[in-house]
Amino acid sequence: MGKIKLKNRKALVVYDNKDDFEKNQTFALSLIKELQKKKLNAEVLLLENKDINFEAKINEAELILNRSRKVDFLKTNNQINTFLVNPFNVVFIANDKYETYKWLKQNRFLTVNSSLLSKETIKSFPVIVKKRNSHGGKDVHLVNSADEIKHLNIENATEWIVQPFLSIGTVEYRAYILFGKIIKVIKKISNANQFKANFSQGAEVSLFKLKWFTKRKIKKIAKRLREGYYAIDFFLNRYNRVIVNEIEDAAGARALVQLCPDLNITKIIIRTIISKFKKFLKKKLIS
């Protein structure tokens, strides 16, 4: 079998809309640049711009880096003939917090108890109420009474989950995962005015070294999720046991870039993706 050639093969970096792209523009364009270095014909595609060439671009792409947190734009053909990063299962599990909870429980990983929002599911206060598709700390609320829930903009309760408030939640850890391997881990500490430890909302961040048994647990979770680039957000209880909070599909890298300015994260990501992509293409040729 001859060498797999990448020249002029079509690749897409997909974002949902212009605002999302502009927020992550440096990262997105760096991904494009690294793909072009590998001789691929790469471009950014926004899902909100469904022009006459939209379907053709999706169908022609052999490699799609899906940063949109959505899968409904992909066809059956893409599932078979396109190398997707992240794959369907990661996108589906990570972008619905109730599905994340169910998947973690099914696989017997410790996580924060979650249930669909209703009067019956709240036994005591305070609680955390969050939208199932929220990310970046948006639509996440600390609620101290039933009256406070009434003042939230909730139209459909089934789109929201409720969790117990954990005192350890002001310190959160994020493991950046690339095809089952841990790139780096950061520690996030919420500022005095916040109960959530999000970098985009002013959390203090630092690099963190995992103990061997914690690393083993994170790798076990990553192995079950399989391939892709994503992040696992977790807490550590007083026994240093991992309690998974969320799985971040379109994981941002701003905190990592700030802490590791010499780490070319997009180069590492694309180098690994290209290696996997070549294996995918070889497998297609054989079959």
From Swiss-Prot:
Q: Which Pfam families match?
A: RimK (PF08443)
Could you cite one Gene Ontology molecular function of this protein? metal ion binding
Which residues belong to any copy of the ATP-grasp domain?
A: 115-287
PROSITE patterns, per the entry: ATP_GRASP
Q: Which SUPFAM superfamilies match?
A: Glutathione synthetase ATP-binding domain-like (SSF56059)
GO CC, alphabetical: cytoplasm
GO process terms (BP): SOS response
Q: InterPro entries per the record?
A: ATP-grasp (IPR011761), ATP-grasp_RimK-type (IPR013651), ATP_grasp_subdomain_1 (IPR013815)
Q: What is this protein called?
A: Uncharacterized protein MG011
Q: Which organism is it from?
A: Mycoplasma genitalium (strain ATCC 33530 / DSM 19775 / NCTC 10195 / G37) (Mycoplasmoides genitalium)
